[in-house]
Amino acid sequence: MKRICVIAVMGAGLMWPCAGSAEILALVNYESKSEEALKAFRSPVPGQRRQEGIAVIDVDPASPNFKKIVETIPLPADLVAHHIFYNRDSSKAYVTALGKAELRVIDLSKRPFTAKTVAVPDCQVGEDVVFSADNKRWFLTCMGSSKLIIGDGVTDQPIQTVSLPQPYPHGIAIHDGIDRVLVTSTVRATDLKDAGEHITAIEASTGKVLSSYKVSSKPSPAGDAPVEILFVPGANPPVAYVTNMFGGTLWTATWNAQKKDFDVAQAFDFATIKAGVPLEIYFNGKSDRLYVTTAKPGHLNIFDISKNAAKPELLKSIPAGEGAHHVAVTKDEKLAFVQNSLLNLPGMSDGSITIVDLAKGEVIGSIDTLKDQGFNPNCIVLLPQWNHPAGH
């Protein structure tokens, strides 16, 4: 972790780095908690006025500014900013939005941070973004309009709209080596119903839709809601993991080079550990550990995949908060920060950030900065100098 000190600029309410002490800075987008959740606060809190923003928080337990917000990027109160993704060289951050047909793009080389608005008129309920290996194109899933938007990675303008055969695209993964993009079919955005059961393969170079694969062993309609998907870095043959949000299972999609197609199979059932709502997927640097969050109850689950990716071995389930969702990992892979909130849903919106010592496999602290102000964090990533991509 970088050694710096912080000088408070009182008039601007900002803090700026110079030489002296430790810090790890994270980007955390947030929104006000639900009206029902806000009733629990006995005293007035800022979140009671509908707000959104991206907070830059010092998450280093060794820092004198631990838990402090050192900078804020304001966002419209009706944007419903959802995820934050870095492009391949981590020069820009892309922020998706559930409430507007827009992307926010942040130039990470300039402080204080500002967000450029990019209109994506064909995209309703923007979810996930991935980038081609050459950083020249981005791919955005749109759960409300059932589209995949392909954009220019330099100008950030949309250049192609792909209509998908399966509705409600959410999770997305790309593998340039086999020229494939995989997209999940999740749920109807308006009411979280009509759950999907497929993933769809698209030719990455052209945007041509190729095939769809059912990732459930139940009779249709299975209602399993595949939500996230991610390729294991460096795996040969290529293999991607899929989390089924409502089905409570983990599946694999393994590339069959002879058929130029994917074989899908169930890899793990979270019901065996009395966990549900599996969400995000991450890997360690060696790609022999798989991390999966489960929102109910909130846990960070660690699997050994060194022997057989098709049969991940659960090593430990580390308690986090209700709604355990996104995870940020430090470059040295010593610490993980688990953001605990899912769509402001009851029972899955704790609002804290759990700090996990990955070497010990235990919780060492919690950051309640946003929670205590009546906000829920929706995503977390560390700034590039501290961030491990964890397969993303």
Question: Predicted segments — roles?
Answer:
Residues 2-19:
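Gram-negative bacterial Sec-dependent N-terminal signal peptides
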Residues 18-392:
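Predominantly soluble domains enriched in secretory-pathway, periplasmic, or organellar proteins
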